[in-house]
Design a protein with these regions (language model features):
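Composition-driven recognition of glycine/serine/threonine/acidic- and proline-rich low-complexity segments
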Residues: 2-206
Length: 206
């Protein structure tokens, strides 16, 4: 398979669907944190799986330790989600979520997982729902340090040579909180999404 599997019209349609999904994620995050969320325009690419680790470069907004939460999803479409934070951010989560007392390290990590669960669920659900695909989620888990995408995105030959990657940066400017959401879809799911977009466009035209 090559990247032309998604025609220009279908890629444009997917971009609009992703924009809506990320908008829902921003609304969920704003509701949890009680602050306006600024979302960058999502980037969508079909890439060779060997290039996926390059997408984890967070040098544009963090040159220090990175906290990452991973959450696989499965069902009509199968993939992985990552939520990346500057390593200093978990210490601020208690204040962001309205906790008066200083949390323990374990409590900070629980807050991080809870937050990622909300945002990742909104992102993936916002993409799957318009395409009438049902997805379920595995429990989120924390990855220490800078995550190695090759460990779970590149290394499985059964998932094909290409992956669809949805990448969006977000920040709460007044709360000094920023991060990145990455959604990885394997080649078999890319074929299914192509079919789902075709049905979606036909429904709009009817």
């Amino acid at each position: 398979m090559n990247t032309t599997i998604l025609s220009e019209d279908k890629r444009d349609a997917l971009q609009e669907i992703v924009n809506i999904g990320m908008g829902a994620a921003g609304a969920s995050l704003a509701e949890v944190l009680g602050a306006f969320v600024e979302l960058a325009v999502p980037r969508i690419d079909v890439v060779d799986r060997r290039r996926v680790p390059l997408l984890l470069d967070t040098g544009a907004w963090s040159d220090g330790e990175i906290e990452a939460v991973r959450q696989p999803f499965f069902g009509g479409i199968i993939g992985e989600s990552l939520m990346l934070f500057d390593g200093a951010e978990p210490a601020r989560l208690a204040d962001l979520l309205g906790h008066a007392a200083a949390p323990t390290v374990e409590e900070q990590q629980e807050l991080l997982l809870d937050l990622a669960n909300v945002v990742i669920g909104a992102c993936v659900g916002g993409i799957a729902e318009p395409l009438e695909e049902v997805v379920s989620f595995a429990p989120p888990s924390r990855l220490g340090g800078r995550p190695d995408a090759s460990a779970f995105v590149v290394g499985d030959p059964e998932q094909g040579r290409e992956a669809l990657v949805i990448n969006v940066d977000f920040k709460l400017e007044e709360r000094r909180f920023r991060g990145r959401v990455l959604v990885f879809l394997s080649e078999p799911s890319l074929v299914r999404i192509d079919d789902a977009i075709h049905r979606f466009l036909n429904a709009l035209a009817s």
